[in-house]
Structure formats: C-alpha cells, structure tokens
Amino acid sequence: MYRVRSMESTATSSPSSSLMVHPTNFRVIIVGGSIAGLTLAHCLSKIGVDYVILEKRQQIAPQEGASIGILPHGGRILDQLGLFNAIQRNVEPLTTAHISYPNGFTHTNQSPTLIHERFGLPLAFLERRKLLQILYWSLPDTSRVQVGKTVVSVDHIWGDSGMAVRTRDGSTFYGDIVVGADGVHSRVRHEMWRLAEIDLPGSITEREKDGMTVDYICVFGISASVPDLRPGEQVASLHDGRSFLVFPGKDGRVFWFLLKKLDRRYTYTSAPRLTPLDIDTIAGSFISDHIWNGVSFGSLWERREVTGVTNLEENVFSTWHSGRIVCIGDSMHKMAPNTGQGANCAIEDAAALANAIHGAIEHVDRPSMAEVQSFLRSFNESRLPRVREIYKSASVVVRLHARENLALRLVGRYYLPYSGDVPANTASKLIADGVQLSFLAPSLHSGPGWEKYSMKNGVAKSTVVWTSLGILGLVVFLFLLFRVRARFSSF
C-alpha cells in the first residue's frame, strides 16, 4: 500500500528570506547526491517538501581530482539558499584571463573582473569535492541522504498514484516523483526511457537515445602551487588538437584540464573505455607543451596531487520527463568544461524544478498525475532553449581552444586577442537570464548586468547578431588572404 511519510518539521528559511513553509504530503525521491541533487534538496527544504536522496557511492564527496566553476547565475541561486558565503571562503575569485598560442603569442583580458562588476558575484573555482561537502553538511537533515543505495529499477505504483524505486540492497522507496540527478551514466534516464516505451511506444526515439557523442577526452587534476601561476589568473593554452585550462586557486593550489581531440567522433556506447592507467600515457605525450609565462604542462604534472581522466560526452536531450520521472543536470545535458557552465546549469535545473514544484503544491497538497505531468512538461519546455544555447557556446569554445580547423585557428589567433570586451559580453549574455528561486528573496549581490545583458531585450539579441556577422566577415577575409599564400606559416 502506498503511503507518504510527512516531513519532520517546518524547514528553516534562508537567511535572506522570510518565507513561511508548511510541510506537504508530496514526496520527492532524488537519485544522485550530485550538485544538482543536493541543490534540489536545499530548495525542497525551503518549501517544506519531503524528500530522500539515494546515492550509490559510499560517501557523498570522494576525492576524484575534479574542480568546479561557479558563475554568477549559479552563485546567485546558492546565495538565495544561504550557501554562497561558505563557498566564498574556499575560493580565490578570478580577475584575469590569459590566452597563449603555440607560436608563443599571448593575450590578456579582464573578462572575469568585468563579469564580477556587472553581476555582483565573482567567477569562483573550487574543488568539486569541497562544493559537495558544503551542500551536504549545510542540509537541515543529512539523514535524508542515504549512501550505498544503487538504484536497479523505477516503477509506477498501481493506479499511477506514485513511484517505487528499488535499490540493489533490497530497499524500496516510495514517492510522488523521481528525479534523476545521477549524472551522465544515469540509471534513472534509462528507466524513464523503459517506462516511456511501455506507456507510449516510440515517444522517445532511438535517435534521441543515441544522441550523445564523444569527440574529446579530458585528463584533469589538482597540483600544488606552481611559481609564475598567480591565484585569480586563469590561463587557456591553445594547441593544435588539444588545449589546457588552468585555474590557480585558494592557497596556490592549481586546478587544470588537458582536453584532447580524439581520432574521430564516437557514440556514447562506442567511446573509449578509459582507466587510471591511461592518465600517464595521455599526459606524458604533452609534458613539454607551453602553458604560460615559462610554465610548461610538465611543471603542473610534476606537482600533481590527484588526477583523473574521462570522456567528454556532449549532448542535450530533448525529453527530460515522462510520467512521474524527471531528469536534471548531467543526465540531460553534458557539455565541455571550457565555459564553466556544467555545474551552473545543474544548479539552475534544480532551482527551476523547485519553482515548478512550489507552484504545483501552493494550492494543492498532492498534485494529481495530470497535474504532475503538466508542471514537469512546463519545466522541460522552459529549460530546453536556454540549455541548448549554453551547450552550443561550450561546443564552439572547446573546438576553438583546440584549433580544430582553419577557420577556428584564424578566429582564435587573429580575432579573439583584438575583440575587446566581446568575450565578457558573450559570457554576460549567457549569465543574465539565469533562473532565480521564485519563493525566496533575491540575492543581495547584484549589478546592472542582469538587466543590461538579458537576451529578453532586443539590444542584447542584436549585439549577438552583429558580433556573429563581424566574426564571419573576419574569417572570410582572413581565409581569402591566406589562400594566396603557397604555404601557411605557423600561427
């Protein structure tokens, strides 16, 4: 018999909010103790919604060598939740961006400082592990997070009155909706597809299921302090077929990524199976590559503290929900790390879903199946256009950084260094329309950029068009110029 457990007590409100919360009989099963999953848990706590998090690993925040960028739109949501101050204590805000090229040419701009001034929140970089720890330990009730719970199946309860989630250890969890926040290899996504095929055959096409591809692999890590790499100054080092992203952070620790193009495009299922044994082989090929200011990749490598390797899956799925199941974060959109948007999109997903849930239960204690499907559909439709735009930007930048073709090499070398505030403006347009939590007071950190660079007004849109036309014109000009030369010199 399906029975919903009520919340323990009224959740504490955000320091920046006077929201009065009232526990409801609506229960959410969150699969995955990820950034998306834990952020959603904080949001649900604020509106009195019962939840449980099922995490397959034995600990929430293992040391895996990964790092995370928090941009103003992600930071604004975390600030609404009363979490950003804890994050600020663990970061060195970015102020300067350096770009280096294979021929030794370098360029510096102040995009991070401009973005901070425009939006009132900095670009911050920290260990993924540290962010997970902050999200976990600041929960009102950590007992709602259950580790060692590997999900094996998700099913409807008879009569469509709820969902049952079963785990490998034999446990069963019941709730009104299931949220898949379990990453790129999502089990919930698989179960959503399975149930959708039963309920409405063909509703999720094979083309959609096979949409995720892999063009790049990434070796990433954290190194001890490297002389001549200054905290707060990020570096993008561009090479043919690969790039390095370097972020000197708090206490001199350096977060870095080596992104390497593969020999061809792979599908998700056919991509190389990487293991820790591959790390030394991949990294060892590029030890002598110049990064910045006399620093080579070898300087980072010899000071490495922890490393990892992964395929860089790329895709935005179209269908994020079916029935009472909805997926968020990397389970629905996976993008290259070059624009730092992955975690921020996941945080936005959690906030947008919480807004939808809050709207659905505001006047109804337990929404019906039709009402659940309605608000999940609206959530899906509202998120898709924005995430696609952010994804496209990341897709272009990872290829620009790896100088993937002639046009991108020309743009990267002969347009980007002389483009003024265009990089900051482009980033600002993607930041400005970020989601806010509708049920909490706005962040006290603000700036003129939220309004000025919003894509909801015609000025920002026309700026995008003219910038694109300018780049296109420059590419055509440079292409014609270089065509008359018998050989291309190094650039």
UniProtKB/Swiss-Prot annotation:
MF annotations from Gene Ontology: FAD binding; monooxygenase activity
Biotechnology: Chevalone E derivatives produced by this cluster are interesting candidates for cancer therapy since they synergistically enhance the cytotoxicity of doxorubicin (DOX) in both MDA-MB-231 and MCF-7 breast cancer cell lines.
A Pfam family matched in the record: FAD_binding_3
Entry's EC annotation: 1.-.-.-
Membrane topology: Single-pass membrane protein
Tagged with keyword Flavoprotein: yes
Family, similarity comment: Belongs to the paxM FAD-dependent monooxygenase family.
Main location class: membrane
Glycosylation sites: N380
TM annotation in the entry: 462-482
Protein name: FAD-dependent monooxygenase cle3
UniProt record, GO biological process: biosynthetic process
Entry keyword set: FAD, Flavoprotein, Glycoprotein, Membrane, Monooxygenase, Oxidoreductase, Transmembrane, Transmembrane helix
GO CC list: membrane
